[in-house]
Amino acid sequence: MVNGIVDYLEKLNIKVFGPNKIASQLEGSKIFTKKLCQEYNIPTANFGIFENRIDAKKFLENTKYPNVIKADNLAAGKGVYICNNEQESFMAVEEIFDGKFGKAKNVLIEEFLKGEEMSYFIISDGSTIK
């Protein structure tokens, strides 16, 4: 879906149920979602975005632990590290930039939040809420 299959099928007037290319970025790009939360003041963990391992490691030298390091791409439920120290964090950054989970152009480093994770999926016609 992140490649736009829903958009393509809709252009062919084929009925399809799913998010369009832009909406699917909420699932496909962790960084897209973090920036969206930031833009609309949706509470989220503090974070940094890094395009290379050097800048990521510099940031990690002054961060608190544990932290969370994520590859910014679809990684089949993988590509997320909870790191307890600098050594684990450096290893996570290396593995992500070395392509362990596909070609990630960026790495997301965020504070670790303790608690239960919750996800919601909501289906709407765009105006009706029941």
Task: Map each language-model feature to its residues.
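A short, GP-enriched loop/loop-strand-helix hinge that lies immediately N-terminal to
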Residues: 1-28, 41-51
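Short, well-ordered alpha-helical microsegments
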Residues: 2-6, 56, 117-118
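Residue-level recognition of oxygen-bearing side chains
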Residues: 32, 55, 88
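Structural element of the ATP-grasp superfamily
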Residues: 36-38
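Conserved ATP-binding module of the ATP-grasp superfamily
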Residues: 43-45, 66-68, 83-119, 123
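Short amphipathic alpha-helix with an adjacent loop that forms part of the alpha/beta core around
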Residues: 57-62
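Helix-loop-beta segment of a Rossmann-like dinucleotide-binding subdomain
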Residues: 74-78
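Short acidic-glycine loop/turn motifs at beta-strand connectors
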Residues: 124-128
